Amino acid sequence: MAGRTQGKHRPRVRTCPSLVPFDNPCWPPSHQPLPLQVGAPGHRVTSFLSGRAWPSYIPKGKHGLPGPRYVPDPWSLGVLGHVAPLRVTTTIFLPGASPGVMLDPACQKTDHFLSCYPWFHGPISRVRAAQLVQLQGPDAHGVFLVRQSESRRGEYVLTFNLQGRAKHLRLVLTERGQCRVQHLHFPSVVDMLRHFQRSPIPLECGAACDVRLSGYVVVVSQAPGRKPKVVSRGGVTASTARTKLPSWLRLLHGVIHVISPGSSNTVLFPFSLPHWDSELGHPHLSSAGCPPGHGAEALRGQVTPPEQIFHLVPSPEELANSLRQLELESVSSARDSDYEMDSSSRSHLRAIDNQYTPLSQLCREANL
């Protein structure tokens, strides 16, 4: 009985979220713990430990009040090797955010690296991305687009046409815009695309899967109140583009396809377009409406600079006007086509399920 009574009065041990007071001289300046409350109401910063919890003995002082709190110095213990290093995790609630709801800033930190480019389609689905790159079948081998990943927030996917089939390659972007694709690292997504324009995409299946980026899908917002229409059936050739499109578009050679599915006009452009400024992310137009260096003087025999991967795309208003003019002239030839895939192509209309297929399986599919 006496033992039980003494057990009730033993000092209780509990964990303390604040390990060391701010005035502890043993704690290095670079490892100061975070305060439990910072700034005005609404800015709440909480910290907790994962792994070992440090005990805090609270003995009774005079008149039954809590006495001085003793907390062992975790820095000295970690240096001596008695305990494993601690990992401190912080949770930050911004003003207006409900407590307990974690914000996902991954997309917000990396979207601005891609949102200015015409080949970035944002949060479209895998099936929609596969449809866009499969529109021309095997003829659009190497056509690509970049989109946000559906299953992994903050990551991106390169969807491209491989011999008429849509394949998906995951991209990882850092907060500084650096890009990683499998074992390859690039300073930016632009450098990655330029690399895959010159070198095959690493699918590890030899020459049968040799694919280089040859064109990209451009999405232009459709004018409000207009119903989507098919602009061309078999694609716009270079001759028709020179006669039916404005001066800046007459310079395009080998335009693959121009359609308007869903709620937006979709244009597939090859890489032989005028230069696209990869750093500023917007086109440069001269006073005559033609890209700099691609006017009449450049067409008379001057040597053009090496081909670039990103090129001039006009403003959405100008491109919408040109597409509208092209619709009026080619609507008669588009009545007998609804762009439905045939039975052989319809089986490959969707993307490769919900999970990313291993590269070895992609190689086997390509060899079939």
Curated annotation (Swiss-Prot):
Matching InterPro entries: SH2 (IPR000980), SH2_dom_sf (IPR036860), SH2B (IPR030523), SH2B3_SH2 (IPR035059)
Signal peptide extent: none
GO biological process assignments: cellular response to chemokine; cellular response to interleukin-3; embryonic hemopoiesis; erythrocyte development; hematopoietic stem cell differentiation; hemopoiesis; intracellular signal transduction; megakaryocyte development
Domain SH2: 119-217
Reported tissue expression: Preferentially expressed by lymphocytes in lymph node and spleen.
PROSITE patterns: SH2
One Pfam family it belongs to: SH2
Record PTM text: Tyrosine-phosphorylated upon T-cell activation. The tyrosine phosphorylation site is multifunctional and may associate with the SH2 domains of phospholipase C-gamma-1, GRB-2, and PI3-K upon T-cell receptor activation.
GO molecular function annotation: phosphate ion binding; protein tyrosine kinase binding; protein-containing complex binding; signaling receptor complex adaptor activity; stem cell factor receptor binding
Membrane-spanning ranges: none
Residues carrying Phosphotyrosine: 356
Superkingdom assignment: Eukaryota
Keywords, ordered alphabetically: Phosphoprotein, SH2 domain
Coiled coil: none
Function, as annotated: Links T-cell receptor activation signal to phospholipase C-gamma-1, GRB2 and phosphatidylinositol 3-kinase.
Record family assignment: Belongs to the SH2B adapter family.
PANTHER family: SH2B ADAPTER PROTEIN, SH2B ADAPTER PROTEIN 3
Protein's UniProt name: SH2B adapter protein 3
Organism of provenance: Rattus norvegicus
Encoding gene, per UniProt annotation: Sh2b3
